[in-house]
């Protein structure tokens, strides 16, 4: 395992141990619902299914088509807030 992968694993473990990972996930979930991201993605899923026909779409097809749009639709403000929280966490746990 290279140094970056090792560091990532240590940080992830610390996020899990402290419960911060769950708090970040919950914050992200709430922010995405609040900004309408979830509704936009749900509508896009329905469009794809209607366009291709329910019999011709697998879950894997849907995930492959929706994922890039889903990532692109996340507002910059949400990304920045999450990044700020992660940086604050890392600053508090600088001994990692």
Swiss-Prot record:
One of its GO terms (molecular function) is chromatin binding. GO terms for biological process: chromatin organization; poly(A)+ mRNA export from nucleus; positive regulation of DNA-templated transcription; protein transport; regulation of transcription by RNA polymerase II; transcription elongation by RNA polymerase II. The keyword Transport applies. It holds the Pfam family EnY2. Keywords: Activator, Chromatin regulator, mRNA transport, Nucleus, Protein transport, Transcription, Transcription regulation, Translocation, Transport. Its main location: nucleus. Gene3D superfamilies: 1.10.246.140. It comes from the Eukaryota. InterPro entries: TF_ENY2, TF_EnY2_sf. GO terms for cellular component: DUBm complex; nuclear pore; nucleoplasm; SAGA complex; transcription export complex 2. It is found in: Nucleus, Nucleoplasm. The keyword Transcription regulation applies. Component of the nuclear pore complex (NPC)-associated TREX-2 complex (transcription and export complex 2). Component of the SAGA transcription coactivator-HAT complex. Within the SAGA complex, participates in a subcomplex of SAGA called the DUB module (deubiquitination module). Involved in mRNA export coupled transcription activation by association with both the TREX-2 and the SAGA complexes. The transcription regulatory histone acetylation (HAT) complex SAGA is a multiprotein complex that activates transcription by remodeling chromatin and mediating histone acetylation and deubiquitination. Within the SAGA complex, participates in a subcomplex that specifically deubiquitinates histones. The SAGA complex is recruited to specific gene promoters by activators, where it is required for transcription. Belongs to the ENY2 family. This is Transcription and mRNA export factor ENY2. The lineage of its organism: Eukaryota, Metazoa, Chordata, Craniata, Vertebrata. The gene is eny2.
């Amino acid at each position: 395992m290279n140094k970056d992968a090792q560091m990532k694993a240590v940080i992830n473990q610390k996020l899990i141990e402290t419960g911060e990972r769950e708090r970040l996930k919950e914050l992200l979930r709430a922010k995405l619902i609040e900004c309408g991201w979830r509704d936009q993605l749900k509508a896009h899923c329905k469009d794809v299914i209607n366009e291709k026909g329910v019999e011709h779409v697998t879950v894997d097809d849907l995930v492959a088509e929706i994922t890039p749009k889903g990532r692109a639709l996340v507002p910059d403000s949400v990304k920045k807030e999450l990044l700020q929280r992660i940086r604050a966490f890392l600053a508090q746990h600088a001994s990692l």
